[in-house]
From Swiss-Prot:
Subcellular location: Cytoplasm
The keyword S-adenosyl-L-methionine belongs to this UniProt entry's keyword annotation: yes
CDD domains cross-referenced by the UniProt entry: Cyt_C5_DNA_methylase
Organism the protein comes from: Rattus norvegicus (Rat)
PROSITE patterns linked to this entry: C5_MTASE_2 (PS00095), SAM_MT_C5 (PS51679)
Enzyme class, spelled out: transferase
Biological process terms in GO annotation: response to amphetamine; tRNA methylation; tRNA modification; tRNA stabilization
Binding site for S-adenosyl-L-methionine: 13-15, 34, 57-58, 76, 376
Chief location category: cytoplasm
EC numbers on record: 2.1.1.204
Protein name according to UniProt: tRNA (cytosine(38)-C(5))-methyltransferase
Length: 391
């Protein structure tokens, strides 16, 4: 097969390019496009020979796109208009303009690409922009399938639920195509229960999710006390859920993704321990889970990602239950016994599936690295979807 000519839009730090390499699909990236100077420096550091265009997508004419003669598009449009914690401006958000421009010129290309892969946040699937994307796919004659997938389904101890669309220009449906449904598992990964799909009802997309079973004791007929706070801000249900995750042997332990070197600079400062102790999501090297790492990791605490307890022999419950009656200095001393630290940028890159040789230019600051990784994607998930798409 002739190598595919790939156009990489919103190329960032090259997650799509790394996924393409990992998939072993014969391909050549004819152009990568991004406006971020910092991201482009990282991309160039890892792919020095790729044609990188540091310009807006709207600044590229239809004729210029035609000259690139690509037959695959990989893209991860800005997610901020669709995030659950954002304003959800959707089409009215100016950051959506470049993607709307792509949807406008796609049908007007001299030659349509054969393959398309798109990644975005959960929330995109219920946006008006997604509706326009689907209309465009159908008008152009693409067969497509949508997914909501997390790296944990590949045995990676990290939650990062993301929306994906893969599309192929052909008349026959994809062999795994489920019209009007969003698959919650990879094709050919076993039987998918109907409740694990998203379904369309009365023209509206609705995602069905299974309620977590928090009653681990089969002798109990009800979850009494599941909502009461035990320690930190965690209920018995929260603790049971985390224990279930940590006992899932299909998922790797975090220790396989950690660095061996000196990580003292990543220890949480005393003021963060004192102020945010009850908000921290704490994991150990033996844990089989971690929260999604966002671009605010390292700068903000709540909801930006897990922190690592490196003093594994210290019982976290005992520490937290002793805190309420202590003065601030003693609280800090107690919490310091856990030796909590941030995951390093390299460790987050490992969890995101970037290869060992992936790196940053020396001048890229730690804060910038966290931000870039938080805006990136999981390489392994995209790689598997590319393999499925090009089979």
């Amino acid at each position: 097969m002739e190598p595919l000519r790939v156009l990489e839009l919103y190329s960032g730090i090259g997650g799509m390019h790394h996924a393409l390499r990992e998939s072993r699909v014969p391909a050549h990236v004819v152009a990568a496009i991004d406006v971020s100077t910092v991201a482009n420096e990282v991309y160039k550091h890892n792919f020095p020979h790729t044609h990188l265009l540091a310009k807006t997508i709207e600044g590229i004419s239809l004729e210029e796109f035609d000259k690139l003669s690509f037959n695959m598009i990989l893209m991860s449009p800005p997610c901020q208009p669709f995030t659950r914690i954002g304003l959800q401006g959707d089409m009215s958000d100016r950051r959506t303009n470049s993607f709307l421009y792509i949807l406008d010129i796609l049908p007007r290309l001299q030659k349509l690409p054969k393959y398309i892969l798109l990644e975005n946040v959960k929330g995109f699937e219920v946006s008006s922009t997604r509706g326009l994307l689907i209309q465009t796919m159908e008008a152009c004659g693409f067969q497509y399938q949508e997914f909501l997938l997390s790296p944990s389904s590949l045995g990676i101890p990290n939650s990062r639920l993301r929306y994906f669309l893969i599309a192929k220009l052909q008349s026959e449906p994809l062999c795994f195509q489920a019209p009007g449904q969003i698959l919650m598992e990879f094709p050919n990964s076993g039987t998918v229960q109907p409740q694990e799909y998203a379904v369309v009802e009365e023209g509206k997309l609705r995602v069905r999710t299974r309620e977590p079973d928090v009653c681990l004791d089969s002798s109990s007929t009800q979850c009494s006390g599941q909502d009461s706070i035990l320690f930190k801000h965690e209920t018995a249900a929260d603790i049971d859920r985390k224990r279930q995750q940590d006992s899932d042997l299909s998922v790797q332990m975090l220790k396989g993704f950690l660095e061996d070197g000196d990580t003292a600079q990543y220890l949480l400062p005393a003021k963060s321990l004192l102020r945010y102790a009850l908000l921290l999501d704490i994991v150990k090297p033996t844990s089989r889970r971690s929260m999604c790492f966002t671009k605010g990791y390292g700068s903000y605490i709540e909801g930006t990602g897990s922190v690592l307890q490196t003093a594994e022999d210290v019982q976290i419950e005992n520490i937290y239950k002793s805190l309420p009656d202590l003065p601030p200095e003693e609280k800090i001393a107690k919490l310091s016994m856990l030796k909590l630290r941030y995951f390093t940028p390299k460790e987050i890159a490992n969890l995101l599936g970037f290869p060992p040789e992936f790196g940053f230019p020396e001048k890229t600051t730690v804060k910038q690295r966290y931000r870039l990784l938080g805006n990136s994607l999981n390489v392994h998930v995209v790689s598997k979807l590319l393999t499925v798409l090009c089979e």
